[in-house]
C-alpha cells in the first residue's frame, strides 16, 4: 500500500508540474539562466552598438549571451525568441530570433548568459556602460521555482496531505511488522540491522517513485512539446519530494527501533508497541488533518463564490468577443518615468486613445479592484464602505457614450443626443430613479471629483459640469471585468458617469491619458492599424482579446477548484487512515479491558468513553484554531461532523471485528 501511494503521489506531482511548465514555459526558461532585466536607459544607443559590445564580450569570455525578443502574431499573442551574441550556438529548446525581429525590438529587455565563463557582474557592468539603468539581476534557482509552484494555496495543502498519508501508512506497516521483527530481535538480529532493513525497503519504494516521476516527466515533455528546461524542474521536484519522504522514513524507522528496545520481549512477541508515543503522533496528525479539511472546505467555499461571480458574466461576454486590450512594454514604462519624455508620451497616447474611441473604442471603468468578495473596502478618504454605496469610489461606472448603446441602457433619443453632444468641461450623470431626491448632493460630489486640479491639488484648473439624466431602477450593469483582482461582472443600479476624451480638453486625466485595463478597442485588425498609425507600436507588448482573457481566468478558477476538491478527498482519505490506525492501536492496548467492560453490560459509548473524550479534545482544539484561521463557524461545524461520523463508523467497524476475537482474548492470547 505504501509503495503504491509513493508511486501515485509522484505521478500526481509530476503531472501538475508538467501542466505548469506547459502553461508558463517562458517563466521556466527565464529561471533556468543567469539573467539581467533592463528597465530604463539614460542615453541613446543603437542596436548595432549593443550588438558589437555584447558580441565582443561574449567572444572574450568564450560565452553565449542571449537577448529575449518579444514578437506579436496576427492573433495578438506574444512569442519569445532570442537574439544570440557571440560565436557559440543557441541551446536546444530556445528559438533563435531573426535579424528583422532583433532590429524591430526594443532595447529594454532581458539578457541571459546562455553558456560560458561570463559572470553576471561583468555583463551588468557592460550593459550599464552602454547607458542602461535600473537593472535587475537574477540567478537561476530551481528550488525557488519549486516553492513558487508548490508553496501556494491548494498545492501546499495537497503536499502536506501527502506527507500525512505517508506517515499514517508507515505506522500501519510498522504495526503489522512488529511481531515478526520482535521474533528476529530475540533471535539475535541487531537493532542496526533492523533499522537498515527498514531503510532499504523504504529507499527502494522511494527510488521507484523517483524513477516513475522522472520517466513520466521526460515522456510528458516530449509528447506535449514542453520546453526541455522543464526536465531539471521536474527532476528536482521529484528528488525534493522523495527526500522529504526519506526524512520521515528515517525519523520513524529510528523511533521504530527505539520502541523495539523499550518494549518488553514478551510484549514484542505479541506485537505490542509503545502506544503513548505513537498515539501522541497520531493525535497530532489527526489535528493537522482536521485543520487541512477546515482549510479545504473554506477555500472551496471561497472559490465556489468566485466561480459564481465570474460565470455570471459568461452570457454577456459571449456576445462581446471582439474587444481588444493593449499591454505596454518596458519602453513605455521608462519614458513614462522620464520627466523630459513624459509630456510628449502623454500627448501621443491621448491622441491615440481619442482616435480609438472615435473608431468604436470604449471606456468601462469600475471600482471592483478596491473591494473584497463581500463587497467591502477601506478607502483612505471615504473610510469603510460597501460596493453599494453611492460615491465616486464605489457604486459608480465610468463609461463612454457608446457603452449606453452596446448595453442597451434605457434612454430616449433626446437624452442620447444630449449625451453624445457633451462638450469640454461636461459629463453625463445617469442616476437610478430612486436617487432623484439626492440629485443636488450627488451632482456636487461628482463635479468636485472630476474637476481637474493642479499638481498640488489645491487649485481647480478646469471645472466639470454634470448633465443629469435618469435611468431605471433594479438593473444590473455589465462591467466588462477581465482583471484577476476581482471576479464580479455586474454592478447593481450603479451611477453611470458618461465621459468623452474631449470632456477634459487638453488636460491630463485619469481616464484617457494612458492605456489601462478599462480601455477597450474594437477589433484586433482595426486596433493594430490604429496603433501603427498612432506611432505607438514600439510601446505595445501584447494585444489581448478581452473575452479570451476572461475565459482564461475561468479556466484557472476551474483548475484551482478541482485541485482543492482533489486535496479535500485526499485529506479525508488520510484522516480515515489515521483514524483506522488509531483504532487498531487503541484496541491493541485496551482489548481485554474493553471486553471485561462489555461483559459487565456497558453500552458502546460507555465502553469507549476515553477514546471519545480524546476525540472531542482534538475537535475542540482543531475547531478553535480553525475558527481563528477562517472565522467561519459553519466550516468548523461541518468538519467536526465529518470527522465525528468518520470516527464512530470506524470504531463500530473495528469493534465488530474485535467481538469475533473475544473467545481468543479470553484464553489470554
Task: Give the location of each predicted region.
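Interfacial "coupling" helices/loops that link adjacent transmembrane helices in transporter permeases
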Residues: 167-203, 578-614
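Short helix-loop junctions at transmembrane helix boundaries
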Residues: 214-242, 616-644, 649-659
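Internal/C-terminal transmembrane anchor helices
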Residues: 271-304
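C-terminal membrane-exit region of the final transmembrane helix in multipass inner-membrane proteins
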Residues: 242-275, 642-669
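N-terminal membrane-entry
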Residues: 143-162, 236-244, 551-579
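"Rare, low-scoring activations can occur
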Residues: 43-146, 426-564
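Membrane-proximal extracellular/periplasmic loop immediately following the first transmembrane helix
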Residues: 23-86, 300-408, 413, 417-418, ...
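Selective transmembrane-helix segments that form parts of the transport pathway or gating/packing helices
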Residues: 5-12, 192, 196-217, 241-248, ...
Amino acid at each position: 500500500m505504501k509503495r503504491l501511494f509513493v508511486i501515485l503521489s509522484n505521478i500526481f506531482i509530476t503531472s501538475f508540474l508538467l501542466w505548469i511548465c506547459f502553461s508558463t514555459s517562458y517563466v521556466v526558461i527565464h529561471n533556468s539562466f543567469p539573467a539581467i532585466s533592463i528597465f530604463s536607459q539614460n542615453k541613446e544607443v543603437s542596436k548595432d552598438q549593443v550588438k558589437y559590445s555584447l558580441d565582443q564580450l561574449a567572444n572574450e569570455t568564450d560565452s553565449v549571451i542571449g537577448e529575449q525578443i518579444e514578437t506579436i502574431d496576427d492573433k495578438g499573442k506574444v512569442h519569445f525568441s532570442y537574439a544570440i551574441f557571440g560565436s557559440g550556438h543557441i541551446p536546444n529548446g530556445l528559438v533563435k530570433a531573426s535579424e528583422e525581429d532583433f532590429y524591430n525590438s526594443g532595447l529594454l529587455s532581458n539578457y541571459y548568459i546562455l553558456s560560458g565563463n561570463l559572470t553576471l557582474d561583468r555583463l551588468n557592468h557592460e550593459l550599464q556602460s552602454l547607458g542602461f539603468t535600473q537593472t535587475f539581476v537574477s540567478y537561476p534557482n530551481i528550488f525557488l521555482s519549486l516553492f513558487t509552484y508548490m508553496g501556494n494555496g491548494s498545492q501546499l495543502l495537497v503536499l502536506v496531505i501527502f506527507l500525512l498519508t505517508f506517515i499514517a501508512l508507515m505506522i500501519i506497516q510498522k504495526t503489522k511488522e512488529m511481531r515478526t521483527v520482535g521474533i528476529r530481535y530475540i533471535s539475535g538480529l541487531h537493532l542496526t540491522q533492523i533499522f537498515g532493513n527498514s531503510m532499504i525497503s523504504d529507499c527502494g519504494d522511494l527510488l521507484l517513485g523517483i524513477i516513475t516521476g522522472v520517466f513520466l516527466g521526460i515522456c510528458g515533455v516530449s509528447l506535449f512539446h514542453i520546453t526541455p528546461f522543464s526536465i531539471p524542474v521536474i527532476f528536482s521536484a521529484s528528488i525534493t519530494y522523495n527526500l522529504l519522504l526519506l526524512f520521515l522514513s528515517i525519523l520513524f524507522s529510528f523511533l521504530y527501533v527505539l520502541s523495539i528496545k523499550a518494549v518488553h520481549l514478551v510484549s514484542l512477541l505479541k506485537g505490542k508497541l509503545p502506544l503513548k508515543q505513537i498515539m501522541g503522533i497520531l493525535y497530532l496528525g489527526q489535528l493537522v488533518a482536521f485543520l487541512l479539511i477546515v482549510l479545504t472546505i473554506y477555500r472551496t467555499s471561497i472559490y465556489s463564490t468566485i466561480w459564481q461571480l465570474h460565470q455570471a458574466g459568461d452570457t454577456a461576454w459571449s456576445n462581446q468577443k471582439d474587444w481588444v486590450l493593449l499591454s505596454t512594454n518596458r519602453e513605455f514604462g521608462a519614458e513614462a518615468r522620464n520627466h523630459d519624455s513624459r509630456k510628449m508620451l502623454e500627448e501621443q497616447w491621448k491622441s491615440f486613445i481619442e482616435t480609438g474611441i472615435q473608431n468604436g473604442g470604449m471606456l468601462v471603468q469600475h471600482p471592483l479592484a478596491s473591494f473584497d468578495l463581500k463587497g467591502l473596502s477601506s478607502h483612505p478618504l471615504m473610510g469603510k464602505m460597501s460596493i453599494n454605496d453611492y460615491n465616486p469610489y464605489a457604486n459608480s461606472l465610468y463609461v463612454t457614450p457608446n457603452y449606453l448603446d452596446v448595453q442597451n441602457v434605457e434612454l430616449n433619443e433626446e437624452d442620447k443626443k444630449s449625451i453624445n453632444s457633451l462638450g469640454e468641461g461636461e459629463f453625463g450623470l445617469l442616476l437610478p430613479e430612486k436617487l432623484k431626491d439626492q440629485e443636488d448632493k450627488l451632482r456636487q460630489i461628482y463635479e468636485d471629483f472630476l474637476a481637474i486640479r493642479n499638481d498640488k491639488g489645491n487649485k481647480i484648473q478646469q471645472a466639470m459640469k454634470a448633465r443629469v439624466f435618469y435611468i431605471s431602477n433594479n438593473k444590473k450593469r455589465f462591467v466588462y471585468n477581465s482583471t484577476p483582482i476581482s471576479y464580479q461582472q455586474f454592478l447593481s443600479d450603479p451611477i453611470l458617469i458618461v465621459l468623452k476624451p474631449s470632456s477634459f480638453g487638453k488636460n491630463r486625466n485619469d481616464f484617457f491619458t494612458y492605456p489601462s485595463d478599462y480601455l477597450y478597442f474594437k477589433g484586433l485588425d482595426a486596433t493594430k492599424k490604429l496603433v501603427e498609425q498612432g506611432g505607438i507600436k514600439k510601446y505595445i507588448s501584447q494585444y489581448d482579446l478581452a473575452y479570451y482573457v476572461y475565459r482564461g481566468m475561468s479556466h484557472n478558477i476551474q483548475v484551482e477548484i478541482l485541485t482543492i476538491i482533489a486535496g479535500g478527498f485526499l485529506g479525508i482519505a488520510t484522516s480515515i487512515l489515521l483514524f483506522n490506525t488509531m483504532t487498531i492501536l487503541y484496541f491493541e492496548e485496551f482489548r481485554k479491558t474493553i471486553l471485561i467492560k462489555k461483559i459487565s453490560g456497558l453500552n458502546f459509548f460507555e465502553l469507549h468513553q476515553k477514546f471519545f473524550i480524546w476525540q472531542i479534545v482534538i475537535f475542540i482544539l482543531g475547531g478553535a484554531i480553525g475558527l481563528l484561521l477562517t472565522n467561519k463557524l459553519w466550516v468548523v461545524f461541518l468538519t467536526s461532523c465529518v470527522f465525528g461520523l468518520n470516527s464512530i463508523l470506524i470504531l463500530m467497524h473495528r469493534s465488530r471485528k474485535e467481538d469475533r476475537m473475544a473467545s481468543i482474548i479470553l484464553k489470554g492470547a
